């Protein structure tokens, strides 16, 4: 007896393919779906044979579906993707922030598009190949880290709504990547094991985001040229190529030599300035996070909550105290955290559970020990 009908997001890679395989073996009725989000070549890239949205990847997903005997469809969301994700990407850089398009796409494009199509196809559930887990507890759907901490993708799912989580299956969360490769080999999908994985942003040709911005924004270089590199005290030490071409924490590619290592510590878009400093000057003691989506706990108003907070995808996280003030989360770190970039996602953890997350609005220097005693 079938457990239910599931719409599986399939990129053609090993993770989403084995997601479909596992659910098929568990007795679900599967419909595979591949999203076309962007035309890589039209955005200035060389012909791309592999990776997200390529013809080869679509064919790979279809071949898995045919092999397992379930239907496969293609969903073209390029217009929606461009209107929301691409527009946000350019506007964030023009505002001096560093966007995270993959998290934004998960939250506002992919899940919504999957659920809308699932409804049309009478699918009770959707599924993806993320390495994370979801459980239902105390009336809440809680995202938690996957078994494979090296591949854990819970950070990317902080923005998915409770309603969406209630219909989401993540079968890879209880496996490690080597285990998934072994399953693929055992089930006759050895070609998936050797297929290269794409880690680039799907719409950035050859990882050249500067070139992408120049093509997307008319007269960008004219708008932002002639800006100043300054030190933390305001001393002008050089001229930069345009503030949108830099990000907080950047050291390489600055085109300036001061006799000691310097990093971008702040971007002042309104002044067309890029602030440079030492590694120590890059540290911040806290930050303000807005546009929150709370998971494990719906509201932290009036509470002080200990957490481990991540400020970027590959960040192991730092001990922090959370204080919610309306729609702003104040985050106080026990020790200085480096390269907190406005525009990136901040995700709050309690153990392996995602408490919630939001977008970094600003960071500040205010030693947390003046307010809290952190046990280290």
From Swiss-Prot:
Positions of region (Interaction with tRNA): 151-153, 312-313
Superkingdom classification of source: Bacteria
Compartment(s): Cytoplasm
InterPro entries to which the protein is assigned, alphabetical: MnmA-like, MnmA-like_C, MnmA-like_central, MnmA-like_central_sf, Rossmann-like_a/b/a_fold
Enzyme active site: 105 (nucleophile), 202 (cysteine persulfide intermediate)
GO terms, biological process: tRNA wobble position uridine thiolation
GO molecular function: ATP binding; tRNA binding; tRNA-uridine 2-sulfurtransferase activity
Disulfide bonds: 105-202
Site positions for Interaction with tRNA: 130, 344
A Pfam family recorded for this sequence: tRNA_Me_trans
Entry keyword set: ATP-binding, Cytoplasm, Disulfide bond, Nucleotide-binding, RNA-binding, Transferase, tRNA processing, tRNA-binding
Reactions listed under catalytic activity: S-sulfanyl-L-cysteinyl-[protein] + uridine(34) in tRNA + AH2 + ATP = 2-thiouridine(34) in tRNA + L-cysteinyl-[protein] + A + AMP + diphosphate + H(+)
One cellular component term from this protein's GO annotations in UniProt: cytoplasm
Annotated SUPFAM superfamilies: Adenine nucleotide alpha hydrolases-like
EC class: transferase
EC number(s) recorded for this UniProt protein: 2.8.1.13
Gene3D superfamilies: Adenine nucleotide alpha hydrolases-like domains (2.30.30.280), HUPs (3.40.50.620), Translation factors (2.40.30.10)
Residues engaged in binding ATP: 9-16, 35, 129
Family, as annotated: Belongs to the MnmA/TRMU family.
Classification via HAMAP family: tRNA_thiouridyl_MnmA
Role summary: Catalyzes the 2-thiolation of uridine at the wobble position (U34) of tRNA, leading to the formation of s(2)U34.
Name recorded for this polypeptide: tRNA-specific 2-thiouridylase MnmA
Gene: mnmA
């Amino acid at each position: 007896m079938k457990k239910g009908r599931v719409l599986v997001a399939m990129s053609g890679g090993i993770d989403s393919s084995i997601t479909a395989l596992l659910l098929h073996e568990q007795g679900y009725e599967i419909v595979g779906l591949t999203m076309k989000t962007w035309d890589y070549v039209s955005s200035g890239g060389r012909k791309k044979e592999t990776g997200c949205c390529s013809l080869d990847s679509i064919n790979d997903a279809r071949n898995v579906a045919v092999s397992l005997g379930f239907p496969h469809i293609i969903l073209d969301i390029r217009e929606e993707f461009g209107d929301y994700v691409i527009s946000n990407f350019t506007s964030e850089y023009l505002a001096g922030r560093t966007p995270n398009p993959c998290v934004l796409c998960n939250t506002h494009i992919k899940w919504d598009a999957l659920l809308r199509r699932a409804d049309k196809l009478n699918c009770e559930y959707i599924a993806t190949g993320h390495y994370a887990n979801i459980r239902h507890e105390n009336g809440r759907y809680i995202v938690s880290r996957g078994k494979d901490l090296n591949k854990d993708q819970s950070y990317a799912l902080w923005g998915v709504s409770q309603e969406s989580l209630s219909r989401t299956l993540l079968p890879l969360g209880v496996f490690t990547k080597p285990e998934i490769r072994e399953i693929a080999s055992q089930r006759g999908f050895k070609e998936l094991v050797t297929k290269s994985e794409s880690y680039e942003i799907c719409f950035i040709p050859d990882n050249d985001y500067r070139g992408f911005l120049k093509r997307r924004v008319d007269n960008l270089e004219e708008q932002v040229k002639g800006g100043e590199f300054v030190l933390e005290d305001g001393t002008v030490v050089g001229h930069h190529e345009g503030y949108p071409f830099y990000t907080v924490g950047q050291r390489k590619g600055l085109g300036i030599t001061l006799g000691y290592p310097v990093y971008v510590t702040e971007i002042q878009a309104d002044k067309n300035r890029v602030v440079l400093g030492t590694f120590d000057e890059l540290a911040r003691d806290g930050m303000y996070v807005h546009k929150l989506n709370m998971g494990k706990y719906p509201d932290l108003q009036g509470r002080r909550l200990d957490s481990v907070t991540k400020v970027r995808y590959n960040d192991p996280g730092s001990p922090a105290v959370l204080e919610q003030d309306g729609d702003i989360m104040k985050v106080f770190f026990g020790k200085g955290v480096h390269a907190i970039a406005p525009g990136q996602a901040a995700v709050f953890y309690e153990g392996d559970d995602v408490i919630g997350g939001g977008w970094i609005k600003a960071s500040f220097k205010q030693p947390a020990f003046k307010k809290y005693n952190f046990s280290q």
